[in-house]
Each structure stands twice: as C-alpha cells, then as structure tokens.
Amino acid sequence: PDPCCNDKCDCKEGECKTGCKCTSCRCPPCEQCSSGCKCANKEDCRKTCSKPCSCCP
C-alpha cells in the first residue's frame, strides 16, 4: 500500500507530506494568486495555474 496518508492526510505546500500519497489530500483554497498567475480571479487562478500560491487545492 501507499505510505501513510490513507485515512488522515497531512497537507504541506499543496501536496501530501513527503513520502505520503493520498488523493483526498487538499489544502485550504488560496487567498490570492502569485505574480506569475495572470487570471481575473483566484478561482480561475486555481484552475489554470499549476501552483499559484503556497497551498492550493
């Protein structure tokens, strides 16, 4: 089985903790986009940018 993160996920920088694999691991939505993301709003930014901020869903 995949290491840890099966029932409880520890999110870090938008992904599961190092060494963990978990499809349900999601961090809180970003508050704002980074300078590298040219989107109208944070919803579009989350959809189109690979990693607009420190913690993305």
From Swiss-Prot:
Family from the record: Belongs to the metallothionein superfamily. Type 3 family.
General function of this protein: Metallothioneins have a high content of cysteine residues that bind various heavy metals. Class I MTS in marine crustacea are involved in the sequestration of elevated levels of heavy-metal ions.
Residue sites binding a divalent metal cation 4 per the record: 30, 33, 49, 53
InterPro entries recorded: Metalthion_crustacean, Metalthion_dom_sf
Annotated binding of a divalent metal cation 1, by residue: 4-5, 16, 20
Positions of the UniProt region annotated as Beta: 1-28
Protein's name according to its UniProt entry: Metallothionein-2
Keyword Metal-binding: yes
Keywords of this entry: Metal-binding, Metal-thiolate cluster
Organism for this UniProt entry: Scylla serrata (Mud crab)
Residues reported in the UniProt entry to bind a divalent metal cation 5: 33, 37, 55-56
Residue positions binding a divalent metal cation 3: 11, 16, 25, 27
Binding site for a divalent metal cation 2: 5, 9, 22, 25
Keyword Oxidoreductase found: no
GO molecular function: metal ion binding
Binding site for a divalent metal cation 6: 39, 45, 49, 56
Upper lineage: Eukaryota, Metazoa, Ecdysozoa, Arthropoda, Crustacea
